Amino acid sequence: MYQKDNASLQIDLVFKCNDFSNLSDPFLYQPGNLIFESSFWEEVLLCWINIILSEKNTSFPNFIFDKKIFSLSLQIINNNEISSINQKWMDKSGPTDVLSFPMISDEDTTKNLNFIELGDLFISLEMAFQQSLEFDHSIKKEMLWLASHGFLHLLGWEHNDDNELDNMLNFQEYLISKLD
């Protein structure tokens, strides 16, 4: 996994994963599967933060580059829960794969702080599983894909046209490739 000599960076992750032990596919939810562990996501997110901060990518707000502590929540939930959130906050019906709710507003609110509250990230495990079958890759890869997409949104990256979306998707691939 990508390592940068920057031990002073920290991730403050509030992690929640529903109990999916009753799912019909035994390969999806297995105790010990890293995608269900907070420590796995802390390591992944810290790796991605290190990469982003070391590369000074211009797609992100400048004020994130002097922060040392990054706080966010990640919840792995089911289709019913993500449908409810999608309806309430996005005014869209039905489940979606990932929702992100960024907290970043502007430099003035964070300039004297060494931490930044990024926001909340919700991933539907059921949608991730369906998409992993559709795209013929592992559930872990799909979860990393969805997490990277939502995480980039938490950092302020938007895709308002096809070019911006292509750039974002390419950067997601890059981030995931650095985990190997």
UniProtKB/Swiss-Prot annotation:
Gene3D superfamilies (alphabetical):
Metalloproteases ('zincins'), catalytic domain
This protein's GO CC annotations: cytoplasm
Annotated compartments: Cytoplasm
What keyword terms does UniProt attach to this protein? Cytoplasm, Endonuclease, Hydrolase, Metal-binding, Nuclease, Ribosome biogenesis, rRNA processing, Zinc
Q: Which GO terms describe its biological process?
A: rRNA processing
Q: What is its main location?
A: cytoplasm
Extract the Pfam families matched here: YbeY
Q: What class of enzyme is it?
A: hydrolase
Record-given protein name:
Endoribonuclease YbeY
